[in-house]
């Protein structure tokens, strides 16, 4: 079965360019603003949209994304409301893939089977669940694949050649390479190290590889995009959003444009280079 992610990466390969993958927390700073930003992302240049599912114990997230999750929870964001945002986005945008990223606990509480039915119906294309290792594929990964939802796995600098086949076994859509060891937003990605790591992953899979963590500027995104099929930017966008909020954490008049302006600049950087693999 061909998914939106398969189609998008195949189209980009024909165009000879990498994808800009954007991450924002659903419901940050509120559901209405979150949907407005999401609707504006494709036109600004986002090729794939990652949406965070807010969770009370986000162990892999740095301070910026943790704070975004807390703002979203304070605004009343739930997993059901996150799916509603995707559903509303889909009313006007059929082509751009949407990937939900987060932790297993909210999905487990929602109910895996019910979640997959609702996610598919809402227009979700893929899942990144950071705390489910390959050894637990029966929990969510295999049911997701059966439901026609891509399951995207993370590879890191510490994922060696012995471990990589297990990580990649049931991965689909793309592989997410975490360019630094640690939490989101903590350091800058090293493009030489990224190039070597992506080449190593490519020896084990034909899937597109997207690189995230440590990419904050159009220049950095362009450097990384030379080595892979996509550059993922999250913390920088969350920081741009946060900078527009008032003292109570409410959206300001330029909250949407602050995010989309940065996305447009990042897109210009990413789309202006030809990946080595193209």
Curated annotation (Swiss-Prot):
Q: Does the keyword Transmembrane helix apply?
A: no
**Residue numbers annotated as active site:** 50 (proton acceptor), 61 (proton acceptor)
The Gene Ontology terms for molecular function here are: tryptophan synthase activity
Q: Which PROSITE patterns match?
A: TRP_SYNTHASE_ALPHA
Q: Which cysteines are joined by disulfide bonds?
A: none
Annotated EC: 4.2.1.20
Pfam families (UniProt xref):
Trp_syntA (PF00290)
Q: Which chemical reaction does it catalyze?
A: (1S,2R)-1-C-(indol-3-yl)glycerol 3-phosphate + L-serine = D-glyceraldehyde 3-phosphate + L-tryptophan + H2O
Any GO CC annotation of this UniProt entry? cytosol
Q: Which domain of life is it from?
A: Bacteria
Q: Which InterPro entries match?
A: Aldolase_TIM (IPR013785), RibuloseP-bd_barrel (IPR011060), Trp_synthase_alpha_AS (IPR018204), Trp_synthase_suA (IPR002028)
Question: Which pathway does it take part in?
Answer: Amino-acid biosynthesis; L-tryptophan biosynthesis; L-tryptophan from chorismate: step 5/5
Q: Which UniProt keywords apply?
A: Amino-acid biosynthesis, Aromatic amino acid biosynthesis, Lyase, Tryptophan biosynthesis
Report the enzyme's class at the first EC level: lyase
Q: Which family does the similarity line name?
A: Belongs to the TrpA family.
Under the heading PANTHER family, the entry gives:
TRYPTOPHAN SYNTHASE ALPHA CHAIN, CHLOROPLASTIC, TRYPTOPHAN SYNTHASE, ALPHA CHAIN
Q: What does this protein do?
A: The alpha subunit is responsible for the aldol cleavage of indoleglycerol phosphate to indole and glyceraldehyde 3-phosphate.
State the NCBIfam families in the record.
trpA
**Partners and quaternary state?**
Tetramer of two alpha and two beta chains.
Q: What protein is this chain from?
A: Tryptophan synthase alpha chain
| Organism (species) | Afipia carboxidovorans (strain ATCC 49405 / DSM 1227 / KCTC 32145 / OM5) (Oligotropha carboxidovorans)
User: Where is the organism placed in the taxonomic lineage, from the top?
Assistant: Bacteria, Pseudomonadati, Pseudomonadota, Alphaproteobacteria, Hyphomicrobiales
């Amino acid at each position: 079965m061909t998914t939106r992610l398969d189609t998008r990466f195949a189209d980009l390969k024909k165009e000879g360019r990498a994808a800009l993958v954007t991450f924002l927390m659903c419901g940050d700073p509120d559901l209405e603003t979150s949907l407005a930003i999401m609707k504006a992302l494709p036109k600004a240049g986002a090729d794939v949209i990652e949406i965070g599912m807010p969770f009370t114990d986000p162990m892999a997230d740095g301070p910026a994304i943790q704070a975004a999750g807390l703002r979203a929870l304070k605004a009343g964001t739930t997993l059901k409301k996150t799916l509603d945002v995707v559903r509303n986005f889909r009313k006007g945008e059929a082509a751009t893939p949407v990937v939900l990223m987060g932790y297993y606990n909210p999905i487990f509480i929602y109910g895996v089977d019910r979640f997959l039915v609702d996610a598919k119906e809402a227009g979700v294309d893929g899942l990144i669940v950071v705390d489910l290792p390959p050894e637990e594929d029966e929990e969510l990964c295999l049911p997701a694949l059966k439901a026609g939802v891509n399951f995207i796995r993370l590879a890191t600098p510490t994922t060696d050649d012995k471990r990589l086949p297990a990580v990649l076994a049931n991965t689909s859509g793309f592989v997410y390479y975490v360019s630094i060891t640690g939490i989101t937003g903590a350091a800058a990605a090293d493009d030489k190290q990224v190039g070597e790591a992506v080449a190593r992953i490519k020896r084990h899979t034909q899937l597109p590889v997207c690189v995230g963590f440590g990419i904050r500027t159009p220049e950095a995104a362009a450097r990384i995009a030379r080595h892979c099929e996509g550059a993922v930017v999250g913390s920088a966008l969350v920081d741009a959003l946060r900078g527009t909020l008032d003292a109570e954490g409410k959206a300001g008049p330029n909250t949407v444009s602050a995010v989309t302006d940065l996305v447009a600049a990042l897109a210009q950087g990413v789309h202006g280079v030809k990946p080595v693999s193209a």
